[in-house]
Amino acid sequence: MYVVTPLLLRGLTGSARRLPVPRAQVHSMPPEQKLGVLELAIGFTSCMVTFLLPAGWIMSHLESYKKRG
């Protein structure tokens, strides 16, 4: 069984190595206008709230989660 497994895996990965990998052609231009302080503050605040609010909720209720489990 163990002798056959590497041969099977080598057979599966051998055909995958020959497949062409598509490459993305992404071209961008510089922004037309710079972002202001208010726009940066709103974007930064929304990102921080999105990531930190759920983590804070979980951390503040960790003891109740431990008691339930």
Curated annotation (Swiss-Prot):
GO CC annotation: mitochondrial inner membrane; respiratory chain complex IV
The name this protein goes by in its record: Cytochrome c oxidase subunit 8A, mitochondrial
Motif SIFI-degron, residue numbers: 2-19
Assigned keywords, A-Z: Membrane, Mitochondrion, Mitochondrion inner membrane, Transit peptide, Transmembrane, Transmembrane helix, Ubl conjugation
Annotated transmembrane regions: 37-60
Mitochondrial matrix compartment spans: 26-36
Keyword NADP: no
Extent of the transit peptide: 1-25
Keyword Manganese found: no
UniProt subcellular location: Mitochondrion inner membrane
Domain of life: Eukaryota
Gene: COX8A
A GO biological process held by the record: mitochondrial electron transport, cytochrome c to oxygen
Subunit text: Component of the cytochrome c oxidase (complex IV, CIV), a multisubunit enzyme composed of 14 subunits. The complex is composed of a catalytic core of 3 subunits MT-CO1, MT-CO2 and MT-CO3, encoded in the mitochondrial DNA, and 11 supernumerary subunits COX4I, COX5A, COX5B, COX6A, COX6B, COX6C, COX7A, COX7B, COX7C, COX8 and NDUFA4, which are encoded in the nuclear genome.
Post-translational modification: In response to mitochondrial stress, the precursor protein is ubiquitinated by the SIFI complex in the cytoplasm before mitochondrial import, leading to its degradation. Within the SIFI complex, UBR4 initiates ubiquitin chain that are further elongated or branched by KCMF1.
Associated pathway: Energy metabolism; oxidative phosphorylation
Family: Belongs to the cytochrome c oxidase VIII family.
Membrane topology recorded in Swiss-Prot or TrEMBL: Single-pass membrane protein
Entry function: Component of the cytochrome c oxidase, the last enzyme in the mitochondrial electron transport chain which drives oxidative phosphorylation. The respiratory chain contains 3 multisubunit complexes succinate dehydrogenase (complex II, CII), ubiquinol-cytochrome c oxidoreductase (cytochrome b-c1 complex, complex III, CIII) and cytochrome c oxidase (complex IV, CIV), that cooperate to transfer electrons derived from NADH and succinate to molecular oxygen, creating an electrochemical gradient over the inner membrane that drives transmembrane transport and the ATP synthase.
Organism: Ateles belzebuth
CDD domains, per database record: Cyt_c_Oxidase_VIII (cd00930)
Alphabetical list of Gene3D superfamilies matching this protein: Cytochrome c oxidase, subunit 8
Topology feature Mitochondrial intermembrane, residues: 61-69
